[in-house]
Amino acid sequence: MIMKLVSDQIQERKFIIEFQLFNLIDELGLSVKKDHERKIFIYALLYVQLMHQPYSAMNTISQLEPVTTYEKIKISYYTNYLSTYLSTSYSQERERIISIISKTFIDSINPEMNLYNFNDFVTMFAFKKLLQQVFHEN
């Protein structure tokens, strides 16, 4: 397993993020051929969510440990973009970041999906909604 989850709070947050991501995958009609990549994305969302919580939640970050070098690199990639997304208020910049994250995620879970022509607006809206739910933005 990619994560070593210690607290019930982290387990609950992980479950919520998994459910929200499942809804996004279903909404876009994606098929997951590489479930490990989906788990890496969940980990990155959870990590950034905990990073941007009040100080009391910061100690829970240390309970999350990626196992392999590949996971560390991929999670770092996602967390850099997600942190930039949260730190900017410029809508054009946020949209570019969402576009990068969504294309990377879709290509990671199923490289064959790149052959399909996704509606960029629908994909953008679905990922924007996911990030708003995960990070409790309005």
Swiss-Prot record:
The gene is cpiA. Induction: Repressed by CpiR. Different environmental conditions may derepress cpiA to decrease pilus activity. It comes from the Bacteria. It comes from Acinetobacter baylyi (strain ATCC 33305 / BD413 / ADP1). This is PilB-specific inhibitory protein CpiA. Acts as a PilB inhibitor to control natural transformation. Inhibits type IV pili (T4P) extension by specifically binding and inhibiting the pilus extension ATPase PilB but not TfpB. This activity probably modulates T4P extension under different environmental conditions. Interacts with PilB but not with TfpB.
